[in-house]
A protein has these predicted regions:
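HotDog/MaoC-like acyl-thioester-processing domains
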Residues: 1-11, 87-131
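Catalytic strand-loop segment that frames the active site of acyl-thioester-processing enzymes
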Residues: 1-51
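Hydrophobic residues in beta-strands and at strand termini
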Residues: 18, 83, 128-130
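Alpha-helix boundary/interfacial micro-motifs
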Residues: 25, 36, 56-57, 72-73, ...
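Hydrophobic beta-strand-centered segment that forms part of the acyl-chain substrate-binding groove
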Residues: 46-99
Length: 131
């Protein structure tokens, strides 16, 4: 899709359902062992619905949608997101995006990540170097 990106084009939608063990694996990879991510009981005691996804993992899914649309990770030059809600394991996340503009071989894509009908990341803006 990368060379054909035009303003108004939608990037391919990504849908992913994080399994119940994802937060533990991500904690090990990231070093973020905050108990809200790995301990259901603790998360509930502090008012959450259960353990929640790491925000940076969710952001990585937004980045993945951009890089797959642009032909690989080399294309992602910048990514900015606004975290708007907490994602939870075992519920599908959908990442969508629309090309805002293309100038001098660089596409600006606006994206959102939603779970259960609510944005968990919004106002995402990626700068993609087109081939």
């Amino acid at each position: 899709m990368s060379q054909a990106m035009q303003p108004g084009d939608e990037i391919p939608t990504i849908k992913i359902t994080p399994d119940k063990y994802l937060t533990v694996r991500y904690a090990g990879a990231s070093g973020d062992f905050n108990p809200i991510h790995i301990d259901d009981d603790f998360a509930r005691r502090v008012g959450l619905p259960g353990k929640i996804l790491h925000g940076l993992w969710t952001m990585a899914q937004v980045a993945r949608a951009q890089t797959e649309a642009a032909g690989g990770p080399h294309a992602l030059k910048r990514l900015h997101v606004t975290f708007r809600g907490m994602g939870v394991p075992e519920h599908e996340i959908t990442v969508t995006g629309t090309v805002d503009r293309v100038d001098d071989g660089v596409a600006i894509v606006h994206a959102v990540a939603e779970q259960d009908g609510r944005a968990i990341i919004r106002n995402a803006e990626a700068e993609l170097q087109l081939e």
